[in-house]
Amino acid sequence: MTQQTGQDADQRPSYKDTLNLLETGFGMRANAIHREPELQAFWKEKGIDLDLGRNNPGPVFTLHDGPPYANGALHMGHALNKVLKDIINKHRLMQGRKVRFVPGWDCHGLPIELKVLQAMNQEQRQALTPIKLRKKAAAYAHKQVAGQRAGFQRWGIWADWDHPYLTLQKDYEAAQIDVFGTMALKGHIYRGLKPVHWSPSSRTALAEAELEYPDGHTSPSVYVGFPVVDLPESLRSKLNAQGLDVPAASDTLSQCLQVAIWTTTPWTLPANLAVSVNDRLDYCLADDGNGQLLIVAAELCDSIASKLERPLQAKATVKGADLAGITYSHPLLERRSAIVVGGEYITTESGTGLVHTAPGHGVDDFNTGRKHGLPVLCPVDEAGTLTAEAGPFEGLNVLKDANAKIIAALEDSGSLLLQESYSHRYPYDWRTKKPTIFRATEQWFASVEGFRTEALTAIDGVQWLPASGRNRIESMVSERGDWCISRQRTWGVPIPVFYQRETGEVLLNSDSIAHVKALIAEHGADIWWEKDEVDLLPSSHKAEAHLWRKGTDTMDVWFDSGSSWASVSSQRDGLSYPADLYLEGSDQHRGWFQSSLLTSVAVNGTAPYRTVLTHGFALDEKGRKMSKSLGNVVDPMVIIEGGKNQKQEPAYGADVLRLWVSSVDYSADVPIGAGILRQLSDVYRKVRNTSRYLLGNLHDFIPSRDAISISDLPLLDRWMLQRTATVLDQISEAFERYEFFRFFQLLQNFCVADLSNFYLDIAKDRLYVSAPNDKRRRSCQTVMALIIERLAAAIAPVLCHMAEDIWQNIPYPTGTESVFLSGWPSVPEEWRDDSLRDPMQELRELRAAVNKVLEECRSKRKLGSSLEAAVRLEARTPALQDALQWLQSKGDQEVDGLRDWLLVSQLQIGGEPWAELLASDDNELAVIEVALSRGQKCERCWHYEADIGQYSDHPGLCGRCVSVLERR
């Protein structure tokens, strides 16, 4: 085969003006910094989000917002959470559901109180009254809410921003008082002296959800011998039976027999009132070779001997129950106590098998002490300082100098067996980042035991995504103790109780609760601090107001946020209770999910949600937590607007941030960083450029005038619609399952593999070269119009700004002014032609195989454009043979279409092998031969045709192009 040269380049006329070139106002660059706010202003001006949420015909969908804390700048965790919620809400809106998303903020608590205090000098702090502090805290919270709200709005989040819920709002506080009151009247609230997690740095009790367990905590652990001064006769008899005689006199006995205990909190030893054993464990009296006997768990005897570096030989073995009643003397104080039977918490996993018991400083200790009638001794004040009850250790701080002084005293007394450092999980105050302690105080508790079974039943009725969430919260609720809900702070919702000044009797009844609730509903919680008892007490007690004092405790902030269902989803218009969905980080199984569940079940016997969906945490690209010290913090606003160095931190816009959220499997922790953002930006550009190409080819297309009926479309166009239908089905399923990473993958593959690299690549010729009204061009435009409308709608929940920009640049009337008014994309049944799927897949694979051979020719510089090539095919597989026969049965036009699909100038199927080949490939699919195409290059369409030069008016054009020019 030969290929001839056409006219010299400088003699060729230009046919550029005869081609159908792209025309669109949809730019290649998003210019997101300017364009996104314009689109957001358009939505607000038209009221599209709120009107759609109110006027949609479908049922209500309520995604109840877990309130972020009103303090600090927004971070990637906020972005992950709020964008996920927005994607879901926008999808439900487009499905026709009524959606009113009410954003919330958690506004009470210590961090805000500390911020207020930090902004004041010592003199100002001393002059600060509780009500002044509350006013300043409220002002600070409102300012923080305003800043965070502006950030959320810039991300394209749709919400009822003018009517958010804040836990400091009076209607919210009143609803919370109602929740507390109902629980109290049902018997679920009580006051008691009990060990609680206490933060000396905050000087308040903490709930489990307010604790964190940082890595690397080390405690000074000690093994201590308590001298035994008396044995029960029953134990003495059992020891004698084993050949072990012990002295009867207590002073002699104490010199030779010790109870060995182990503790990681030496500062609690002044509060020791017992040693506890497990009645079912074996214990031995072991001789250390120096005439000293130690009582330890038999199973631990060898390991303790190794630790103490002294031989221990068991002389007698008894059950734990036999040890009960042994009397020992405190090694540091003038106090005698007894060994008692504890519980299953006493094991042989660590320590000695005998547990130092201080009922004022541990839950197990407290429960054991209560069982045996021990007093609750707590010689530690609110600052963590030992009191006079600690004897010579008074004034020492338990987290500073107390441990060292007590260890030194143990050594001086000869009771210290061993001291060593011990690394373990230890609770810290999540706000101050300082260690906490267990400390018995008078607190208010929610008794979970009263409704635990109901709560577990409610958990079973909820859909947990991922499913592991159910086991997680189920085990937490099953095992959790009573909930300490009181805090010794000023900035919060008051616990509405009164105490009889002389007796301490508590007033908490339906009248007092109703009266306080009504006052707070009208005036807000500040009234508790502004008014005296005479105004706060119900009418039945006003005459004796002088006998009562109001409480000073406030409620745990988890009780605040955990009551949101009562104030928001069950009371506000356009919402539903239980809510359809709660969506927060996986840490909220122990936080908001649980506090909301407990309050809702306690009050109404039902969970406040139907489905709970959790996400992981945002990490850097190396999988590390973000921190200023590591310098790896990614700021969502820098992603959107760019950093100081725009080359290193370019402005990507909100849609790239949103695309990141859709791209990750958020059920686990998710990475984000500069490299990931660059990759996402590339994907964003591909989607945008694909959309631009579709729009640019529709500038002269009006569907009502130019559209071709589906049944009259060529095979490739019908296949493209069939493929679009399949992809849209898969995208819809991904949204329904909240698997947005599948949407991301489907979108990327559809825009790149199906459209850009296949359909649109093939369509260029008929789009550019055909006469404007040619059926082959109008057919392609028909498909492009149908696709761009549905593509815009399908990406709208995620790429909301791009979708709206596409919609506003569709050059023909769409019937709706916003993509969000167009509804979730659906496809007519006539698009679904399964007969096209298999043969077209074979032909796509054939195209890939041909492209591979053509690319080899290009790489060896045997070819420039693929249009310089002619290709002969010979099918090898039955499937491809069937596909080619199927194609031939559709007529010559479709066979010629295959040539266009391959982007070559000539195509031969079957026949004799060619000579003068550029390349060939005999693979499993087909024999592929490539030669130079015959004829000359058309100056307009660039195809090589044999009829070039036969048309005097256009000697450089092929017959097809001459015909087009005659019709233009």
Curated annotation (Swiss-Prot):
Catalytic activity line of the entry: tRNA(Ile) + L-isoleucine + ATP = L-isoleucyl-tRNA(Ile) + AMP + diphosphate
What does the entry comment about cofactor binding? Binds 1 zinc ion per subunit.
List, alphabetically, the Pfam families matched: Anticodon_1, tRNA-synt_1, zf-FPG_IleRS
Task: Name the keywords, alphabetized.
Answer: Aminoacyl-tRNA synthetase, ATP-binding, Cytoplasm, Ligase, Metal-binding, Nucleotide-binding, Protein biosynthesis, Zinc
The record, for CDD domains, names: Anticodon_Ia_Ile_BEm
For the motif 'KMSKS' region, what are the positions?
Answer: 625-629
Residues that coordinate or bind L-isoleucyl-5'-AMP: 584
Localization per record: Cytoplasm
Instruction: Report the GO molecular function annotations.
Output: aminoacyl-tRNA deacylase activity; ATP binding; isoleucine-tRNA ligase activity; tRNA binding; zinc ion binding
Q: Where is it mainly found?
A: cytoplasm
Enzyme superclass (EC)? ligase
Required co-factor? Answer: Zn(2+)
Amino acids binding ATP: 628
Return the EC number: 6.1.1.5
Q: Where is this motif: 'HIGH' region?
A: 68-78
A single GO cellular-component term on record: cytoplasm
| Example of a GO biological process term | isoleucyl-tRNA aminoacylation
The residues that hold Zn(2+) are 938, 941, 958, 961
Q: What family does this belong to?
A: Belongs to the class-I aminoacyl-tRNA synthetase family. IleS type 1 subfamily.
Q: How does it assemble?
A: Monomer.
Q: What does this protein do?
A: Catalyzes the attachment of isoleucine to tRNA(Ile). As IleRS can inadvertently accommodate and process structurally similar amino acids such as valine, to avoid such errors it has two additional distinct tRNA(Ile)-dependent editing activities. One activity is designated as 'pretransfer' editing and involves the hydrolysis of activated Val-AMP. The other activity is designated 'posttransfer' editing and involves deacylation of mischarged Val-tRNA(Ile).
UniProt free text on domains: IleRS has two distinct active sites: one for aminoacylation and one for editing. The misactivated valine is translocated from the active site to the editing site, which sterically excludes the correctly activated isoleucine. The single editing site contains two valyl binding pockets, one specific for each substrate (Val-AMP or Val-tRNA(Ile)).
Identification of the protein by name: Isoleucine--tRNA ligase
Organism in which the protein naturally occurs: Synechococcus sp. (strain CC9311)
Q: List the lineage, top down.
A: Bacteria, Bacillati, Cyanobacteriota, Cyanophyceae, Synechococcales
